[in-house]
Amino acid sequence: TQINATQTILANTQKEGANIDDVNSALDELNKYADLTIYNFTEMTRNIGTFTAAGVDLNTSVNAIKGIANLAAISGSTSQQASTAMYQLSQALASGTVKLMDWNSVVNAGMGGQVFQDALKMTARIHGIAIDEMIADEGSFRETLSKGWLTSDILTETLQHFTEFTDTYNEESLKRQGYTEKEIAEIKQMGITATDAATKVKT
């Protein structure tokens, strides 16, 4: 229930200085988003609880959940599949890296295609990971996961790329991270396309 989830989220985020108002405001934002989409607010809230329990801050958790839902929409996955992916990725976040087993469940949810792989590879390169060489050496994207490069940070950062720009996440913040103008334009467009896919399904 939302009450339980709120308590869980608050307990997990108090250490970063979050209070009940912050949690309620984050959940309100998510509720508004859920209303526009086919995705279930209760499941999203529960998954935010799991994300924050894994040490992901409140804001990043909200964006990651939205990102997963938007990614599910452009991948043509159902809300049930999105929920499975949210759960599996929250488990991966708790462990610190996405392993092959976690990735397989993302693939089974219909969300492990080229779009997500390319987005993850772009983030990896910004973090100085020689992902292209790794793929050449290992033979495929999935085989590189045993190297442990797909960390919580790379995952949550990439998921945010499937959401629309905000006051705190925008051209400026991406530029500071080292993305080029061209990459920023691509990321912005992907966020718009993915959000459209998630919110227009319902109408």
Positions of predicted regions on the chain:
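Small-residue helix-packing and pore-constriction motifs in hydrophobic alpha-helices
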Residues: T1-A34, E43-A54, N63-I74, T84-L150, ...
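Hydrophobic, low-dielectric interface segments
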Residues: E16-G17, N63, E172-T203
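H+5 position of the DHp
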Residues: T37-N40, T78
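Helix-boundary capping/turn motifs
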Residues: Y39-N40, N59-S61
